[in-house]
C-alpha cells in the first residue's frame, strides 16, 4: 500500500500547477523557437511548451538539407540561426569525421564563399544551436507536456484564458501561439480548419485535388511534373499473385482507383523519416531487419526492379537510378536522406488518420512508419531479390550512433509534411504562389515550388500499380504571405496566432511549408502578439503599417 501511495504522489505532483506569461507558445518546432526568442527580445515574458522531449521539430529531426527556394527572402531570427550554424562549422574542432575541405554541399543549399550563413547541418548541431539561442534569452521551456485536447482550452469572451495539459498543469497568458505541425491548439480552441485536399474549383486552382495524371499545368500554363516523377516504371503488377486479381491486392494499395481529377478528398501527402545516415565505420549502425518484418510489404519494390529487365541504369532519368532515395550530404560524413521514385521512404496512404488521431493512435502511426522504413532499408541493403549493385550501394550506409536518443539511431520526429490547415478570413492559394494575386499585408515570404508528395497508391486502367498526388510546379519568384493567413477569424478567437498550420490551400501550403519559412512566420507571430498586448487589442485589429515597421526593424524580408 505504501508503494502505491508513493507512486500516486509522484504521478500527481504537477497536477493543478499554474503558470502565467504574456505569450504562451505551444509547440517548440523551429517556428515555435523563433517565436519564443522574438517574444523574449521584445520584453514579453514567454513560456514555450513542447509535447516531446526535443525542441526544433524537423530542423533537429533530420531535415538538414534546407528546402528554401530563394535564400534572399530569409531574414531575422531564421537567418540568424543559419548564421550560427556557419559559425559552429567554422571551428575546425567540430569536424570530427572528416576535414572541412572534404565536405561538399550541393543543390539549392550550396553555400557560397561570401555567404555568412550555412544551410546544411547535422541534426544534433541544429539542436545545440537552438538550445543556445533559447538559453541566451533565458526562455522557460516545459518538455513532455501535451495539451488535453478535449477540454483543455478555456475561453472567455472569445479569448483563450488558459490551456490545460494532460499532466494537469495550467498555462495562462495574454496571447497564445500554436506552432505545432498538427494544429492541436487551434482545433481545441474551436477554430475553423480543414484536412486533406480541396477541389481545384474551390479557390480557382489547377493543381489541387486528385492528380491522377503524368503532367499538370499551372494557372500560367507552366508544366507541373506530377505522376511523371516518384512513380513506378511501366508494368508493375499490383496483385499478390501476379496477373491474378482474385489473389488480392498487395499491401498498401488503395481500392477503388484514384478518384476524379481535381476533386477534393481527405487524403494527406505521405510522411517519412528524414534519415540521418553515415558511411563512417566507427559511427555506423548497420540496418537491422525488424522483428515483425513481412517480405510481402516490399513485393512492389522487388517487382519494380524486376520490371527493368536488367537495365537498372535506365529505370529513371533523374537522381541515382539504382537507389530510391535522395542522399544529400551533411557535414561529418552524414546525410539527410529523403524519398525519391516510386517505392521509397514515403509510406504512401498510411497517414490519412494522423491529423485527427488521438495521441496514442498517432504514436502507433509513427511506429508503423518507422517499422516500414526500417524494413525498407534492410531490404535494399541485404535482401537477395534486390540487385547486387543496389545492395552494394545501400549496405555501406547505416544510422548514426551520435545523433538521436534511440539506441538504433532512428529519430522520433516523423516528417509531418501537412496535417490540419486553418481556414481564416484569407486563404493563401495557388494564385498567390504564381503572383496572380499579391497580398498587401505581408509578414514573410515563400519561394519554394508548389510541392506535394504522393497521397495514394492504386491500380490504373491498364491494371498496373501507380502513385497519385505528386505535384512539382515551379514558382517563378518569391511571394508574400498574408498577415490574415496566420490569425483566425475574429469571431472564433481574438488572441491566437497560427504560424505553421496557417490558412492555406493544400497546394499553396505545399510551397509555404518549409522550415525557414516557418521560422519567419514564428517570428512574425511573436511581433503580432507583442503589439496586441501593448495595445490591448485583438490580434486581428493591428494597424498593418505599424506591424510592417516592426517586422522590417526586426529583419524580416517582405518584398
Name these PLM-found stretches.
Residues 1-4, 100:
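Positively charged n-region of N-terminal signal peptides that target proteins for export
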Residues 3-13:
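Sec-dependent N-terminal signal peptides
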Residues 18-29:
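Beta1/beta-strand and adjacent pyrophosphate-binding region of the FAD-binding site
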Residues 32:
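N-terminal Rossmann-fold NAD(P) dinucleotide-binding loop
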Residues 39:
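Aromatic pocket-lining residues of Rossmann-like dinucleotide-binding sites
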Residues 44-45, 50-154, 194, 202-204:
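Conserved N-terminal/central alpha/beta ligand/cofactor-binding core
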Residues 127, 169-175, 179-558:
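Flavin (FAD/FMN)-binding glycine-rich loop and adjacent Rossmann-like elements that form
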Residues 151-170:
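Conserved beta-strand-loop-beta-strand element in the redox core of flavoprotein oxidoreductases
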